[in-house]
Amino acid sequence: MNFTKLFILVAIAVLVVVGVQPVDGAPRWKFGKRLEKLGRNVFRAAKKALPVIAGYKALG
């Protein structure tokens, strides 16, 4: 086995991963805010619909 080639390949991979500039956190933060808004909307819709569903089940 040629461990030298493997070592060089791993070293290059580590340098590429470490050398990459950190990406600005804004795009991920926007995604988090959108996800939070979606969760709030679903919660509010369920809160509004629950009495209607409970009343329908009570009648049936």
Curated annotation (Swiss-Prot):
InterPro entries: Cecropin, Cecropin_insect. Its main location: secreted. GO terms for biological process: antibacterial humoral response; defense response to Gram-negative bacterium; defense response to Gram-positive bacterium; innate immune response. It is found in: Secreted. GO terms for cellular component: extracellular space. Residues 1-25 form the signal peptide. Keywords: Amidation, Antibiotic, Antimicrobial, Immunity, Innate immunity, Secreted, Signal. The modification Leucine amide is found at residue 59. Belongs to the cecropin family. Cecropins have lytic and antibacterial activity against several Gram-positive and Gram-negative bacteria. This is Cecropin-B. It comes from Anopheles gambiae (African malaria mosquito).
